């Protein structure tokens, strides 16, 4: 039975990796594929077994990262030890989260385990020196933007442009009426319930982000309500994971 270990560090990685796992499940030769590691609800819905909570890795900023550092280092050590011994996979796939995944990939590659990384770190924008560690840790980089492969070619790192996993889910010409109907269906509302101005409020996908900036978002919502009196306003707040619903409702 083929084994794939993968790690997504936050909801965005979970969202990106789920279509990949779905595609693998449709390949006849991959029947019986065992997928495990760290992932969110979307990856788990595709049959992945998450052995550690993804929320441990979902931190924002230096202060939060420092506070969580002992737990993150402990988790990474446990993960590496597991994957080098009883949970040894045929392939390791790191999804984004380079600060965590590159360290794991480096140790696994040294042990002879093929390593792939989905979503290139933004070395073309900042911290270009990371290419050296990437070349040591990653056997093949899976790029979501076409221009990134040229950077890896020059550095002698194998790469493949795979496209953005979510590109096919976002229409080039959005149908506003259809979108409203889908929202009403999802929230079990009458179609007339969303007449007026609909405003999406996106306070983030990490608990630390929400704790820091959600109050500002709610103040802004109140300000808009006061300034746009007479207009029918609807504020929609998508929740990245079930655990984030409670702090937002509070």
Regions found by a protein language model. Give the residues of each.
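Charged active-site motifs of nucleotide-sugar-dependent glycosyltransferases
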Residues: 2-3, 191-200, 233-234
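Active-site and donor-binding regions of nucleotide-sugar-utilizing enzymes
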Residues: 2-187, 202-210, 223
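Conserved catalytic-core segment of nucleotide-activated headgroup transferases in glycan assembly
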Residues: 16, 206-238
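Long, highly charged amphipathic alpha-helices
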Residues: 19, 23, 216-219, 247
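Short, solvent-exposed coil/turn linker segments
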Residues: 53, 190-193, 244
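Short beta-strand segments at enzyme active-site cores
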Residues: 94, 199, 236-238
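Catalytic donor nucleotide-activated moiety binding site of glycosyltransferases and closely related
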Residues: 233-250
